[in-house]
């Protein structure tokens, strides 16, 4: 069963590389593996579970709806022209700046998918308008989700590490904050190198700016696209307590209202645009995420993921390698390294003292490695969202982020386990 599953995974990767219809490839692969396992219902149950996942659907369709409102009110053009004119003069700082900006937002908006939806809809068009290749622009935002939520005391992974290490969230962060900051710099620098080698850091011609040469900027309209991000950051940091109650979708709706007030566009047209964008987001972005979950269910049905997790648990003598490689590979394969990180920490890290290892270091290593693996997965929700914003194949993003992810996971292991 394991070998059959691995062969199907390789075929799936090949089909994605050939740019066959992504949703169809993932769905067929997941169903075939489920059939081979003798339980086809796992694929159908995964489909149903995804369709009921309001926590995932809500921010995605709201962000895509808001993006469409920005388009019909032309608020996006005001921001794009305002920033693109300045960004073009930054040269080599364009790409690393986008990576670090996304990481900063991701620290507060800890959902990689939610952060990508909120930031990508705004920042990716700006980068493209400034001359960055679409795939590189999307990769910059995608790479920015490398793991900066590990600096947020309220992040779930922090709570788990604190629990198994019998410590506090603040102690966990104090122990690894320097690692997370170093990884941010490595991610930004490595992607910049890739951009320079491929010649994608400048020179891309975008029609976005062709008709804006004599454009008169309305600064209020230019601020509207940033309003939801400002609300979310001020709320999550506690700067404005009232905003703390707002979800991502709420901030997007407020942004739509602001677009109306700034432009006085017909409310009916804004309403139609919002739901058209929401529908497109569901069909493209969420559709791929749903099919990816069907694929993952097929992988699980053949026992591949459980086998990998069990191998890590059964070999505590190589816990350092297991905590790094296991969650990282599972992040790549499944698009999320959280399951492996949590399983490892609750099964192995809890015995760190017996193994002669530092529980805080081991727990953080597993959590960070899983996040880094996700930034190398073409089926990760945030990869799909960013690719959708740039209208490119998710695999094109991975080709650009892979170098940084691999370097970062090695550096993480060295810093937390050997230095």
Residue ranges and their predicted role:
Residues 125-222, 382-419:
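Membrane-core helix-loop-helix motifs of multi-pass transport proteins
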Residues 43-77, 249-304, 329:
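Core transmembrane alpha-helical segments of multi-pass membrane transporters/permeases
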Residues 80-81, 113-126, 155-165, 338-351, ...:
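Re-entrant/interfacial helical elements at transmembrane boundaries that shape
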Residues 2-5, 9, 26, 32-33, ...:
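Long, contiguous bundles of hydrophobic transmembrane helices that form the permeation core
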Residues 59-62, 89-124, 288-294, 313-350, ...:
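Hydrophobic alpha-helical transmembrane segments of multi-pass integral membrane proteins
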Residues 1-3, 52-57, 84-100, 129-137, ...:
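Membrane-interfacial loop-to-helix junctions in multi-pass transporters
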Residues 19-22, 55-56, 68-77, 106-118, ...:
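Short helix-coil transition sites and intra-membrane helix breaks within transmembrane domains
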Residues 17, 45-56, 169-178, 214-217, ...:
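Interfacial loop-to-helix junctions that mark the boundaries of transmembrane helices
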